[in-house]
Regions:
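Catalytic binding pocket for nucleotide-activated donors in carbohydrate/polymer assembly enzymes
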Residues: 100-101, 106-109, 121, 125-130, ...
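Short, charged, surface-exposed secondary-structure boundary motifs
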Residues: 3-12, 28-33, 191-199, 217-221, ...
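Extended catalytic core of nucleotide-activated donor transferases of GT-like folds
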Residues: 6, 92-96, 106-222, 240-243, ...
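N-terminal donor/sugar-recognition subdomains of glycan-related enzymes
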Residues: 2-104, 134
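A short, glycine/small-residue-rich beta-strand->loop->alpha-helix junction that serves as a flexible
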Residues: 84, 111-118, 337-343
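Catalytic core of nucleotide-activated saccharide and alditol-phosphate transferases
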Residues: 180-319, 551, 567, 575-578
Length: 582
């Protein structure tokens, strides 16, 4: 009757609606739930005809029954996966990974992310271009969820030789089998990763990819295995970012003097004001004390990029406001002031230098239209899929401004698109040069420990140590790892995290550290298109040689093969060793 009164065609056609009708309606619902655990189960039922439901049956009882059936099925699937994983041995893994034969690579991600699902897509595309079979595990629709059973079923069906995830490790996903090699790309700060539990959860076939400094923290502070950590940066896909013909009509819309792409449009003052609005009077005083210290640095025309400098301001804020610190509060304040407030101050300071230059400046990203000083330059959000490449190529100068450094995916994608960049100089970009010089001296002088390094009286060594202290904003010998371990790690990865080392003289030509330097370089490069083209091509070469998803993927597979070969060899040695008689 109600369907004659109400037009529910659109409602009933929605993918979120499951319609069970007729005399077998309940039986069909009962069978559907445990067989479709990715679909959220109903929590509320409205009964019109009680005869449809068996006596004593409610939606809660039905869900409990369905959960029991699903758990039984999960146990069965996990048993099958254990049988499959038992066929993997160190020797077989090493041989398979080094043979060049196609692997089955399962990538796990979520549609409820922004950047990460695109990064996983590009990573799997690199595996495919290298000849491997790939499958992505992702929620099939916006209303569906992943869980242990759905994940285990995907593994049982695809039978992966390698599982890859971003920002999650195996132990977080109980549906994943042990024994099959798994790689986590740690791209963001995640509390579960940065914890002793995260390190302790790493099994003998768990591998990590991540940044160089993060390796030092994860290995020496949280217990991650050093020999199963691959230092890299977030990759780029040259297949998705490539220059178009110069006469492509789509470029015309984006031609400008200078462009900058970022969603970091909120001013530092707005960020702090929003935080104050969520807290009591005592917290407001603490936030205000820290912010005034940080803002004074930028008001003086300076910058701060090293976390210890921010930490000291937070510690001073505790003293000034007589606030009792806790580790959790310190961590929250570090995230707020280092990752957000300082980021805004660093970026917006440089943008203010451009306002009066009379150039065609365009800002792409969310919220710029609301910024009182910059709203006239706002051009809306750029689509990552196609528009970004057009912006990079059409802009005479692209800017990259970040206190975290210039070896960023956006810069690499922009270079691959044919875009020229000016980079705001950061200490993190050039410290690799100091490390390289210092490592060279240590090698020549036979220095192998922190004690020897501190005791060295060579004036050049002392000068370089002083430079390291200035950049680190702290005692480099007071970390949870030794300074020599840091120097060794940076040397072993060929200073992959240092833009000054990767791009060499090109970095010096394209970086700026002051308003006067930025104005001078903008004027010069706007008038020299051939120089822009030369530097773009020169800076792209090391990107293609070292930072594409394919290069990183190849290095990962080589690391896994070598690691498992070592394990196999050690097992053979142990088996062949005859214990001495007592």
């Amino acid at each position: 009757v109600i369907l004659h009164i109400q037009d529910w065609q659109k409602l009933l056609a929605d993918a979120r609606v499951r319609l069970f009708a007729g005399e077998n309606a309940f039986a069909e619902l009962r069978a559907f739930l445990p067989a479709n655990t990715g679909c959220p189960w109903p929590k509320i039922s409205v009964t019109v005809d009680q005869s449809i439901w068996p006596a004593g049956m409610t939606i809660d009882v039905l869900n409990q029954e369905s959960m029991a059936i699903a758990n039984q099925h999960l146990a069965q699937v996990q048993s099958e996966l254990r049988m499959f994983a038992s066929t993997f041995t160190p020797q077989s893994i090493a041989e398979q990974y080094s043979s060049g034969k196609p692997l089955n690579v399962l990538g796990i991600t979520s549609r409820y992310t922004t950047f990460l699902k695109h990064s996983m897509r590009d990573w799997l595309s690199a595996f495919a271009r290298l000849g491997h079979r790939t499958e992505i595990f992702i929620e099939p629709a916006d209303h569906e969820l992943s869980n242990n059973l759905v994940m285990a079923e995907a593994c049982a069906r695809f039978k992966p030789d390698l599982i890859v995830m971003i920002d999650h490790f195996r132990a977080e996903m109980p549906g994943l089998p042990q024994g099959i090699p798994m790689a986590m790309w740690a791209q963001d700060y995640m509390p579960k990763i940065y914890s002793p539990d995260g390190g302790a959860a790493q099994g003998p076939r768990d591998y990590v990819l991540g940044f160089a400094y993060e390796k030092m923290r994860l290995v020496h502070e949280f217990g991650y295995p050093s020999d199963r950590y691959l230092i890299t940066t977030i990759g780029m896909d040259p297949e998705r970012f490539a220059p178009r013909p110069a006469d492509d009509p789509q470029l015309a819309k984006y031609v400008c003097d200078v462009s900058f792409v970022t969603h970091a449009s909120l001013s530092a003052e707005q960020i702090v004001k929003e935080q104050m609005g969520r807290n009591d009077a005592d917290a407001k005083r603490l936030l205000g004390s820290i912010f005034e210290q940080l803002r004074a640095v930028y008001d003086a025309g300076k910058t701060i990029v090293a976390p210890p400098g921010i930490r000291r301001m937070i510690e001073q804020g505790f003293i000034d406001t007589r606030t009792q610190p806790t580790p959790e509060l310190v961590q929250q304040l570090m995230h707020l002031f280092y990752m957000r407030v300082n980021n805004a101050l660093f970026r917006h300071q440089a943008l203010h230098w451009l306002i009066d230059l009379g150039i065609d400046l365009r800002l792409y990203g969310r919220g710029w239209e609301n910024h009182p000083a910059f709203k006239r330059f706002a051009r809306g959000v750029a689509d990552h899929e196609g528009e970004l490449s057009l912006i990079y190529q059409a802009s005479r100068i692209n800017l990259h401004i970040s206190p975290l450094g210039s070896l960023h995916q956006r810069v690499m994608e922009g270079l691959a698109s044919g875009g020229f960049f000016l980079l705001r100089r950061s200490d993190g970009d050039i410290i690799g040069r100091h490390y390289a010089r210092l490592w060279g001296f240590c090698q020549r002088l036979g220095i192998t420990s922190d004690e020897q390094l501190k005791a060295c009286t060579d004036p050049q060594v002392q000068e370089m140590l002083g430079q390291a202290v200035d950049i680190h904003q702290c005692d480099p010998f007071a970390e949870k790892y030794t300074f020599m371990q840091l120097l060794q790690t940076m040397h072993d990865c060929n200073y992959l995290c240092s833009a000054g080392c990767v791009w060499g003289n090109d970095y010096d030509e394209t970086s700026f550290g002051s308003k006067a330097e930025l104005e001078k370089k903008i004027a010069y490069f706007l008038g020299n298109p051939l120089e822009r083209q030369r530097l773009t091509q020169s800076m792209l070469r090391p990107v293609l040689e070292r930072f594409t998803y394919e290069k990183t993927t190849t290095r990962l597979l080589e690391m896994i093969a070598a690691d498992q070969a070592r394990v196999a060899m050690q097992s053979k040695i142990d088996a062949d060793t005859v214990p001495l008689a007592a």
